[in-house]
């Protein structure tokens, strides 16, 4: 049984809390793309956890977590994340955390280059809003075949040293000529690799073989995505995307079992919209700055990885319908419905108005999207606390109507509705 948990929008939809909830019925949770540039926040009886690299299933003692070959992994950040978790009583060992030998290493010079390039672009207003975690440069060097993989940390021999020398030589051309920086030291990079070789070699293995056997044995495997459909490198709002494929079709590939097919695709979407970074975000035009400030505070909309204030707006049915299509969703989870408890009327962006005066419900790209204006429908709010509700029929009628209206607009059934951050604060519809 292979299930994907993916984001419908720009990321920050609440995937971590849903993985934490649903993983109780799974044997394995695998991340298949991305790095430490976004965070999954989980709140349970042991406290609040922010996970950037490790799958959210790590909070379940009987679940094995896998970091797939489609990921880019900063060993330095991974060490800190493991330390943070173990300090809160989470047990982590090679028995419950397996790292793909094919995953790309985010090196210190990737992080440095990311910050330098964003600074250079900002001088002309051309920045992308990067998290400065080195993600794009890790993936870029992966495709240029000028970086190391986690498997290299297992065999730190003369061959790996020679490759590192070639990589650093090439990188120094960029660091010195473009950014005017001091050259990267091969010896320092080798010492850095040796440190993390000793730490992570026991965790590194052929996760594809492990997942293949598990699937054939009938184990239940969940694939956890980072970010959302609109950040996918191919299907997102280019160039304001991440540098990996966030769509569900890539899940078996990035995890390590490309010949296997998904059995279930669950999409996660918020009851409103949020976005971190640059690029068109049509829905934010449907609210005043004051209204957005109130929504941001009610939703605590600040990046889990960066702390940056998120851009916010009403639920965007145009973007969400496109996200559902990209993810091939069989069912949906609607998160943070309780955040809207304060609204007398709840706005929904149902279409975009284009510069020629026409309207569309299809998600456009390029300049058409840049210039689009939101078409807004308002529905009655419920103006009461719903955090204690656990059955759909016990929700206020206005809240029920809002959920069914979103189903109509995106064309997919909403099975799960979260009404609070706690693990059990969720309605499961029959």
Language-model region placement:
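Non-transmembrane, aqueous-exposed alpha-helical and coiled segments at domain scale
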Residues: 1-430
